From Swiss-Prot:
GO terms for cellular component: extracellular region. It comes from Mus musculus (Mouse). Its main location: secreted. The keyword Transit peptide does not apply. Residues 379-471 form the PDZ domain. Keywords: Disulfide bond, Hydrolase, Protease, Secreted, Serine protease, Signal. This is Serine protease HTRA4. Transmembrane segments: none annotated. Residues 35-113 form the IGFBP N-terminal domain. The keyword Amino-acid biosynthesis does not apply. Disulfide bonds join 39-65, 43-67, 48-68, 54-71, 79-93, 87-110.
Length: 483
């Protein structure tokens, strides 16, 4: 084809293009509408409109300019438009589109931001939800009715026994970093305060960790982290701080549930199936030991079912997860997660370097379901007595290890080894210390932790004989009464 011919075709094409009518495109129109309502150069909160009352379960969120606060749109509600109404957290504005009659811009519809993968979740109410968004939608409706919202307790349907699917994260080189990035926003730092008898001011007494299990502020931690008549302050990864109240506590399981009232919805962790965990699998422990937030340790699982009897807990029905992931003071209550980011345990106990234990997630799930059932029936937890000790019976192996580490360890063949005294507790007030050995309570010999538990349960006043190094001490303690 000649040059003149090509030039003629090009000219005809340009003329046809110029004669075509402009066709409005939704996203192009939406883009022009955003240009027509630019954000201010400087934010002046005094010029923000009065915030209307938001729908139940929805908190105010920053507008698209990050200046004023507006009511977010819930799932299925309109978003975008001339003023760019945002969606609630974890929702996105998308199709179907419609035109905003007030400004000519295009309105979208808020929908679930999660993908289809692993969408199905099981709620603490025993119902299977098609996605986290569906559960959140049901919870918003429940709050409007004054009903109790459900907590997501696992991935997959409620009737499923879990899967052994090897997630993609387990095949990546930076799998630890990927897990931490996913899990850390849901891990919280707990700071406990007590009132000084001299100044009558609240001073820090101890710290621990926990993790968020509901978007409205339910947090799981260890029971031994909490003590009676103390202020509990929760600090999120964002730095926001809230005062917490105790909702449920079980000292036998060493599990507790506390509640904060956040300004916005919180990121949650889902419980995996600890029964699916395999020996040799990588795990990651997160927490805030020594008040150092976002502390991460990793290790492998030695056994998934270290029975309480193996630890000398003859009457214990708990099977612990043993790992070499380091769990230090303050790490208690933090999550132990697999490489998919699912909670498979709660950091609980360190016996010695390289030997740590976690309460399995299946126990946590049952604890949450029992709490949910009690709330529905209007039953409050029973009052219990609390001493404030973490202890183990002196087995032969433990006795040999302690004598190897400490030549001054008491020359004793039986008793209960106190590996931690909870600060601010009745035990601490009585003078008990870490690494004491309890050999007698109220004139009765003590050889197992059950002996101590039964003595606390049956008596309002305890006379305790303790071995500390080469000393024999006589202490008295009155257990605390807690809910």
């Amino acid at each position: 084809m000649s040059f003149q011919r090509l030039w003629a075709v090009r000219t005809q094409f340009l003329l046809l293009w110029l004669l075509l009518p402009a066709v409005p495109v939704p996203w192009a129109e939406a883009r022009r509408s955003r240009v027509s309502l630019p954000c201010p150069d400087a934010c002046d909160p005094t010029r923000c409109p009065t915030l209307p009352t938001c729908s139940a379960g929805l908190a105010p969120v920053p507008d698209r300019c990050g200046c004023c606060r507006v009511c977010a749109a819930a799932e299925g509600q309109e978003c975008g438009g001339a003023r760019g109404r945002p969606c609630a957290p974890r929702l996105r504005c998308g199709a179907p589109f419609s035109r905003d009659p007030s400004g000519g811009a295009w309105l979208g519809t808020c929908g679930c931001a999660e993908g289809a993968e692993d969408a199905v979740v099981c709620g603490s109410d025993g119902r299977t939800y098609p996605s986290l968004c569906a559960l959140r939608k049901e919870n918003r409706a429940a709050r409007q009715r004054g009903a109790l919202p459900a907590v997501p307790v696992q991935k997959g349907a409620c009737e499923e026994a879990g899967t052994t699917r090897a997630g993609r994260l387990r095949r990546k080189y930076n799998f630890i970093a990927a897990v931490v990035e996913k899990v850390a926003p849901s891990v919280v730092h707990l700071q406990l305060f007590r009132r000084s008898p001299l100044t009558n001011q609240e001073i820090p007494s101890s710290s621990g960790s926990g993790f968020i299990v509901s978007e409205d502020g339910l947090i799981v931690t260890n029971a031994h982290v909490l003590t009676n008549q103390q202020k509990i302050q929760v600090e999120l990864q964002s730095g926001a701080r809230y005062e917490a109240t105790v909702k449920d506590i079980d000292h036998k399981l060493d599990l507790a549930l506390i509640k904060i009232e956040p300004d916005t919805e919180l990121p949650v962790l889902l419980l995996g199936r600890s029964s699916d965990l395999r020996a040799g699998e990588f795990v990651v422990a997160l927490g805030s030991p020594f008040s150092l937030q976002n502390t991460v340790t990793a290790g492998i699982v030695s056994t998934t079912q270290r029975g309480g009897r193996e630890l000398g807990l003859k009457n214990s029905d708990i099977d612990y997860i043993q790992t070499d992931a380091i769990i230090n003071h303050g790490n208690s209550g933090g999550p132990l997660v697999n490489l998919d980011g699912d909670v498979i345990g709660i950091n609980t106990l360190k016996v010695t370097a390289g030997i740590s234990f976690a309460i399995p997630s299946d126990r946590i799930r049952q604890f949450l379901e029992d709490y949910h059932e009690r709330q529905l029936k209007g039953k409050a937890p029973l009052q219990k007595k609390y001493l404030g000790l973490r202890m183990l019976p002196l087995t032969l192996n433990l006795l040999q290890e302690m004598k190897r580490q400490d030549p001054e360890f008491p020359d004793v063949s039986s008793g209960v080894f106190v590996y931690e005294v909870i600060q601010g507790s009745a035990a601490a007030s009585s003078g008990l210390r870490d690494h004491d050995v309890i050999v007698s309570i109220n004139g009765q010999p003590v050889t197992t932790t059950t002996d101590v538990i039964e003595a606390v349960k049956d008596n309002d006043f305890l006379s305790i004989i303790v071995l500390r190094g080469s000393q024999t001490l006589f202490l008295t303690v009155t257990p605390e009464i807690i809910n």
